[in-house]
Amino acid sequence: MQKRVALYLQDAHDLRNGLDYVKYAENRGFEAVWQAESRLVRDAIVPMAAYAAVTDKIKICSGVINNWTRNIGLLASTFLTLDDLAPNRIICGIGAWWDPLAKSVGIKRSKPLTAMRETVVVLKRLLAMERVSFHGEFINVDDIELDVVHGRREPRNVPVYI
């Protein structure tokens, strides 16, 4: 069995150096790079886009973003956009966040499991290019879809890891 190796990046490095690390990892056969999003230091999405732009094969993953600070439309369109940059190489790693940090920015994480389930269900349906209506405790959308006018309309292969 072939070993699977990935690179995990947080915020201890300069972003420009991160580009070099990811290219190095890709050239050495690493399967993936995971970009952390933690505390209030570094967003994961911007580095992921940069990594996608300078690589050709390595999978680009969020490790992890939270399901509270981006609405479901923004979350889905963000991962659609990343998939446009790196088709079939994007993975959405998503978690329920850290309660002390959530509270400090005014977010009450009630029923985190229910909120996560709703997020994942609607996100996957939107990335499958479905028109979605969903009425839950945390997500309420009526007849929305990713409004791709120009570009790829096919369902996107963006795995969601919890």
Spans of features found by a protein language model:
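Generic structural signal for well-ordered secondary structure
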Residues: 18, 41-44, 68, 75, ...
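N-terminal beta1-alpha1-beta2 module of alpha/beta enzyme domains
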Residues: 1-63, 158
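Active-site-proximal loop/turn and secondary-structure-junction residues that shape catalytic pockets
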Residues: 11-13, 39, 66-68, 96-100, ...
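Internal, glycine-rich beta/alpha segment that forms the wall or movable "lid"
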Residues: 76-162
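Short, glycine/charged-enriched secondary-structure capping and boundary segments
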Residues: 20-22, 47-50, 74-77, 105-109
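Structural motif corresponding to the early beta-alpha repeats
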Residues: 61-77
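Conserved N-terminal glycine/acidic-rich loop preference
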Residues: 30, 68-73, 101-103
